[in-house]
Amino acid sequence: MSRVRMDLFTSIDGFTPADQTPDNPMGEDWSRLTAAYTATRTFREKIFGDTSGRGTTGVDDRYGAAFFDGIGAEIMGAGMFGLHAHPTDSDWTGWWGPNPPFHTPVYVLTHSAPRPSIAMEGGTTFHFRDAAIDDVLREARDAAGGLDVRIGGGYGTARAALDAGLVDDLHLMIAPVFLGRGHRLWDDLSGFDTTHTVTSEVAESGVIHVTLTR
């Protein structure tokens, strides 16, 4: 059976950003958490289409490459798609551009569903669902064709999946920064170390990669 995967960025004091706006959908603190990842060769190639070979290699790049492997479907929240930027515009196709980096079916959790599905370049099709995350996960598994399902952000979607015990493989990228504000990822959520095997590795950038595998 396909596995449910999640990759999360967090600060060393356990925060994820909570300052998103329509003009800055990831929040001001997002770039501080993701600086090492966005500098990698894999990110530059997969997200920006840069095939020059520029970008960092090493531990961060190895985890970055694994991020894209074996994914057959994605689940994300409305904020990660960008619905909050143009909530009433039925022609809005999200802020990922004409060729999003997913290349799979993507299920967007939103209370504004039903909305028509949107087929993009490169194989990405956005489907909009107003349903519990475990129900949408069943649909995503069917669409994944035996490959894994990744649950993306934002914070609310990630916490819903963690609270429901849906995540088989969790990869935490802990940036060596203190935010002092935002969403506290682990409040009232415990026991992952008893249900998942925990490993950690420190990258050259100082980012701590923690993996929890069921």
Regions found by a protein language model. Name each.
Residues 1-214:
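Enzymes that bind and transform nitrogen-containing heteroaromatic metabolites
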